[in-house]
């Protein structure tokens, strides 16, 4: 059995130059990994063994132990292009922590019949497509937006602290308080 070349280092786009020895096309979910066997488009296998789980951006490259580079490209997948008043749509999509590719005249999300129905109800136009999906990275430099499902199948409790704030104000001069504090 032949041992696979290992990739223990990831170079971001702009950190490497020259032609890559190969290319691997991965869907959005597949571009979130730590350790996995992959194959280039030419069929050459290699083992990714990164120090931690990493979100791979299109254009980055795995550096193999022998110095060769394998470029990462986004694979085509089923998405829906959203057009119309996209500013409002962007708010609703973001409020649901849904990965979203933001372009000047459209938003692109993965297929989700519930979200699609809501967006149609807001007057947006939806066009199912098959194309590479390159959503924005997560907030605070994490590189990935992870959904926050409130369903019971998540295997964890849901005891987030909830804060309720009650604001009171001093009565205006023309208001009379309900009770005399004295």
Curated annotation (Swiss-Prot):
Residues 146-162 have a biased composition (Basic and acidic residues). Transmembrane segments: none annotated. SMART domains: UreE_N. This is Urease accessory protein UreE. SUPFAM superfamilies: Urease metallochaperone UreE, C-terminal domain, Urease metallochaperone UreE, N-terminal domain. Gene3D superfamilies: Urease metallochaperone UreE, N-terminal domain, UreE, C-terminal domain. Its main location: cytoplasm. One of its GO terms (molecular function) is nickel cation binding. The gene is ureE. It is found in: Cytoplasm. Involved in urease metallocenter assembly. Binds nickel. Probably functions as a nickel donor during metallocenter assembly. Keywords: Chaperone, Cytoplasm, Nickel, Nickel insertion. GO terms for cellular component: cytoplasm. One of its GO terms (biological process) is protein folding. Residues 173-182 have a biased composition (Acidic residues). Residues 128-182 are annotated as: Disordered. Belongs to the UreE family. Pfam families: UreE_C (PF05194), UreE_N (PF02814).
